[in-house]
Amino acid sequence: MKQNRRDFLKTSGLAAGTALLGGLSNNLFANKYINTMKSGKMKFRFRPYTLELKHVFTVAEASRSTTPIMLTEIEYEGVTGYGEASMPPYLGESHATATEFLSKVDLSRYSNPFDLDDILSDIDAIAPGNPAAKASVDIALHDLVGKLMNQPWFNIWGYDKNKTPNTTFTIGIDKPDVVRKKTQEAVSGSEGFKILKVKLGLDNDKEMIETIRSVTNVPLTVDANQGWKDKEKAIDMIHWLKEHNVVFVEQPMPKTMVDENAWVTEHSPLPTMGDEAVQRLVDVPKAHGVYSGINIKLMKSTGMREAQKMLILARSLGMKVMIGCMTETSCAVSAASQLSPKVDWADLDGNLLVSNDIYKGTTVVNGKVTLTDLPGVGITKI
């Protein structure tokens, strides 16, 4: 049977990517780390928290001024790792669903926190779905293990902290005067953003871009959040965006419109990035040939462990990679930033959009993701 272009790309690249993932060791750690661990038990705790946003945040799906999150802790031999689940309402998780899931997590039966794969596989098997709740355990466990090793995760993975990219700052859909104000704050503020991300997908797309261009000419990225429904109009819009110094377009059309997204990618003068269409590792080969690249978010991928596997597989398939976030504290943003030295683009501004962060960690200096040398995910509690 004759294969179409998308199926050929998918099958030809998948074998190589799967082989590469199969070569990953199930245990990153030398015996000297494992053998020095005591035989204590891990204690797991969680509590609900609500992030207050600095501004009402509007995307194609909805608007909100708060984000429910769950804060997690794993304690072992006097050392505590911190984690987080960020749960924007439109994604389907909540304080109630996270409480139900996390109440089933029992880490007391594990004596060795370095058994990351086994522990996280068991967590994943508790129930389907719940990616953010699962990520909160994953992040806390990674933070704990990094602290026990006295190493940040970018160093454990062998990444160069000096190769982090610039991060975007997100401008949500809003009235022109608000957009102008947010844009001016972003480009003239202490972080010195060199690239902005613009939420589109409604009827005022061109007005949004033109309003921003009245303030600054810095490069832009665009996230349509599945808002465009006609592929011909989407292509016309992308050509117009290219003329206005846009670098790439995220999720141009609904994730269910697979053939239409593939057509847009084939005809687009800009890279397209799958976001809502790419949740976990299994989705990466499906996105190959449909999008130019993928947007990895810990709250979709169930955490750092699977996110790194997604990064490796996407690279083996020749795809572009960006690392993104939800509105989060510096805990989850710093965890995601550990992967940033290996991506093309970063969208790690979620902690900068909230007014009640309870951690300090990764910062933005002259527009660039700047990692700390603190062990684990690189955070301290405020």
Residue ranges, per PLM feature:
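Metal-dependent enolase-superfamily TIM-barrel catalytic cores that perform enediolate-based chemistry
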Residues: 153-268
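Metal- or metallocofactor-binding catalytic centers and their adjacent structured scaffolds
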Residues: 38-46, 62, 75, 80-148
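C-terminal segment of N-terminal export signals and the immediately downstream linker at the start
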Residues: 24-55, 75
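Catalytic alpha/beta core domains of metabolic enzymes, predominantly
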Residues: 256-261, 267-273, 277-348
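Conserved, mostly hydrophobic/aromatic
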Residues: 72, 78, 137, 150, ...
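N-terminal export signals
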Residues: 7-29
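Flexible C-terminal active-site loop/helix
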Residues: 13, 39-51, 69, 77, ...
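N-terminal secretory signal peptides
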Residues: 1-4
